[in-house]
């Protein structure tokens, strides 16, 4: 058993931490409140190779694994910049294309993931299907060599910033019964693709959208893997990277909140000479949150290590557990930090209440805590499936 990062991973952690701190939470919040995007941070991280750490070197990437990408997600979040697009683009989309794309799709897309110049967002959720992906109603039908895609998607993050959307659909002849997904790379400027912004109670420069696909015409090579049989394994390939990186973001956010709070409570004095952090009523909840965050962090390391060793099934169990634990720990840490700061906790200036919406959403998306508990009950505890 080894709990140490390699020297290269340590260097990556330090370098990403330094970059994140240079931008910081006030940059993130200012972009969110002015309707902007974190373009400068994304582009700089891309130039420095941090967004492509998990892309193979032959395509210009860092040749690392999910461990490296999780480090990038955690450290940017720990600096107050939790970037959701890291989860959808380099974690989900790049992995799907790397593992299940055709040679031509790898050559075409992976270099853009390697330097961050390409953003591909991910669209699976639908209004009438929700957590039940077997009910997906977005349909792809053949028209000569082309495909025509029609359907609706909801809560899709970052469409306005991306060049492509990776759309999960089903073919016309597989319109009922168990999902046989087909994944398509849809350019965001394709005719027939439109979107409208959802008003969300989350302070973030990354937004969610309703997506409308009305007979979007796509060439044959838009189908990931070039074959309908590639759909299901391609969809599954994205799940572990998604769970693990979103968990890393949660842990980073939890660390950020605890750091803000402990800086404050160590120096704030309202009862004579001792800091409020000397009072166990203030310090213990923070210590409890720190324990939860660190436990989630351990599970992320285990999940990423298993994934990078090619042990996908075990990584799936640990990745789900890590995502659950990190979602709970992040929500606890931010809420506890707000309380420890008192009134200052609710101000924009102290930069913790600004994360309340994001960490609350982290218990719902990209997979809800209940669906993870269903997975654990079924696959770890051997219980009958209820749905
Ligand atoms: C900030 C944010 C960003 C998102 N970004 C994306 C994105 O980029 N791309 C994308 O495709 N989607 C995205 N989503 C959607 C997200 O993945 C879904 O919201 C999530 O999967 C839950 O689906 P739902 O909202 O339809 O909830 P529903 O499926 O309607 O569920 C509602 C509630 O019921 C519970 N529930 C449902 N079924 C069961 C069951 N069998 N057992 C126990 N409990 C159950 C759920 O856990 C949940 O609490 C995003 C959502 C948010 C909030």
Positions of predicted regions on the chain:
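A short, Trp-centered hydrophobic/proline-enriched beta-strand micro-motif
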Residues: 116-124
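Flexible, small-/acidic-enriched active-site or ligand-binding loops
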Residues: 135-137, 189-217
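Helix-loop "lid/cap" segments that line or gate small-molecule binding pockets
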Residues: 91-100
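Short glycine/proline-enriched turns and hinge-like loops at secondary-structure junctions
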Residues: 64, 132-134, 158-162, 177-180, ...
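A short core secondary-structure module
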Residues: 150-195
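A short, charged helix-loop
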Residues: 209-237
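Short Ser/Thr-interspersed hydrophobic loop/turn segments at strand-loop and sheet-helix junctions
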Residues: 49, 72-77, 169, 186-190, ...
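Alpha-helical interface subdomain recognition
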Residues: 1-79, 83, 100-105, 112, ...
């Amino acid at each position: 058993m080894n709990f140490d990062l390699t020297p290269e991973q340590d260097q990556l952690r330090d370098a990403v931490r330094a970059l994140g701190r240079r931008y910081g939470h006030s940059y993130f919040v200012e972009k969110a409140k002015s309707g902007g995007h974190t373009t400068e941070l994304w582009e700089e991280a891309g130039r420095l190779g941090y967004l492509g750490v998990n892309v193979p070197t032959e395509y210009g990437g860092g040749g690392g694994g999910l461990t490296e990408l999780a480090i990038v997600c955690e450290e940017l979040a720990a600096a107050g910049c939790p970037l959701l697009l890291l989860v959808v683009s380099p974690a989900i989309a790049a992995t799907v294309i790397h593992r299940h794309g055709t040679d031509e799709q790898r050559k075409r897309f992976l270099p853009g993931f390697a330097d961050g110049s390409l953003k591909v967002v991910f669209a699976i959720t639908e209004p009438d299907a929700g957590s039940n992906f077997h009910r997906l109603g977005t349909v792809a039908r053949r028209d000569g060599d082309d495909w025509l895609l029609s359907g609706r998607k909801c809560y899709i993050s970052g469409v306005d910033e991306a060049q492509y959307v990776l759309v999960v659909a089903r073919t016309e002849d597989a319109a009922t019964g168990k999902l046989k997904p087909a994944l398509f790379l849809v350019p965001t400027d394709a005719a027939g693709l439109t979107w409208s912004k959802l008003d969300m109670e989350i302070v973030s420069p990354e937004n969610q959208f309703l997506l409308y696909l009305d007979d979007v015409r796509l060439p044959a090579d838009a189908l990931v893997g070039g074959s309908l049989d590639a759909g299901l394994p391609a969809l599954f390939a994205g799940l572990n990277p998604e769970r693990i990186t979103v968990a890393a973001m949660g842990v980073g956010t939890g660390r950020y909140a605890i750091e803000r709070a402990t800086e404050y409570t160590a120096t704030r004095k309202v009862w004579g000479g001792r800091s409020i952090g000397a009072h166990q009523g203030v310090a213990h909840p923070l210590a409890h949150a720190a324990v939860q965050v660190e436990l989630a962090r351990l599970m992320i390391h285990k999940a990423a290590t298993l994934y990078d060793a090619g042990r996908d099934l075990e990584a799936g169990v640990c990745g789900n557990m890590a995502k659950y634990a990190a979602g709970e720990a992040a929500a606890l840490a931010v809420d506890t930090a707000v309380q420890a700061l008192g009134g200052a906790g609710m101000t924009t200036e102290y930069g913790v209440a600004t994360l309340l919406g994001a960490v609350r959403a982290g218990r719902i998306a990209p997979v809800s805590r209940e669906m993870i508990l269903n997975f654990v009950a079924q696959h770890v505890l051997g219980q009958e499936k209820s749905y």
